[in-house]
C-alpha cells in the first residue's frame, strides 16, 4: 500500500502514531527561478546551462508550495496538541533549523519551515524523527535520522 501522508496530520499506522510534515526550500537554485513567460526565458536558460548554474523553472521543476503556509503549520500544531504533543515517530522532508545547521553549517539557510520544525523539536515527545532532504544516510543525535537511500524497519 502507498499512503500520501498529508502535511500536519497525525496518522495511526500499525498501532504507532506518526506526525507527517512535508516540504522544504530548494537549495539548488543559485541560478534563480525562471518563468516560462519571460521574453528572455530561452536566453537565460541557455546562459545558465552553459555555466552549469543550478536553476529551477516555475511550475515545471519548482513550486511556491514547496514550503508550508501558515494554515498548514497551524493545522500541524492543532493536531499535535490534540495528541498532547506525543507521537511515536515524526516524518518530514527537511529538519529543524538547529539540526540543519549541524548538518550543513551556513550552506543551508533557515526558513519558516525549518523554524517551524524547530518549534516541533522543542515541544513534541517522540521516539524517532526521520527526514531526507539532504541526500545522505546518517544518524543525527539519538532520535533524528537523515535517510536517503535506506529502508529502515520501525517498531
List each language-model region with its residue ranges.
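Short, flexible micro-motifs
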Residues: 11, 25, 135
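Short, flexible, glycine/charge-rich loop motifs used to bind or transfer phosphoryl groups or to couple energy/partner
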Residues: 8-9, 76-81, 117-120, 136
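Active-site-proximal loop/helix segment associated with metal-binding centers of metalloenzymes
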Residues: 16-108
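Residues that form or immediately flank small-molecule/cofactor binding pockets and catalytic motifs
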Residues: 7-9, 23, 149-152
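Conserved beta-sheet core of the metallophosphoesterase superfamily
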Residues: 95-155
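Short His-Asn-centered micro-motif
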Residues: 7, 21, 92-93, 131-133
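Glycine/small-residue-rich loop that forms an oxyanion/phosphate-binding "nest" at active or ligand-binding sites
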Residues: 1-6
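Beta-strand-turn-beta hairpins that frame and shape the catalytic cleft
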Residues: 10-20, 89, 141-145
Amino acid at each position: 500500500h502507498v499512503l500520501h501522508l498529508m502535511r500536519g496530520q497525525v496518522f495511526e499506522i500499525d498501532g504507532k502514531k506518526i506526525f507527517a510534515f512535508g516540504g522544504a526550500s530548494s537549495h539548488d537554485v543559485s541560478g534563480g527561478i525562471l518563468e516560462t513567460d519571460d521574453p528572455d526565458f530561452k536566453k537565460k536558460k541557455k546562459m545558465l546551462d552553459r555555466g552549469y548554474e543550478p536553476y529551477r523553472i516555475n511550475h515545471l521543476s519548482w513550486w511556491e508550495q514547496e514550503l508550508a503556509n501558515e494554515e498548514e503549520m497551524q493545522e500541524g500544531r492543532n493536531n499535535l496538541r490534540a495528541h498532547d504533543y506525543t507521537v511515536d515517530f515524526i516524518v518530514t522532508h527537511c529538519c529543524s533549523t538547529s539540526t540543519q545547521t549541524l548538518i550543513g553549517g551556513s550552506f543551508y539557510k533557515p526558513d519558516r519551515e525549518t523554524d517551524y520544525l524547530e518549534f516541533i523539536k522543542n515541544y513534541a515527545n517522540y521516539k524517532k524523527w526521520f527526514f531526507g532532504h539532504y541526500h545522505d544516510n546518517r544518524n543525527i543525535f539519538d532520535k533524528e535520522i537523515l535517510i536517503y537511500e535506506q529502508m529502515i524497519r520501525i517498531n
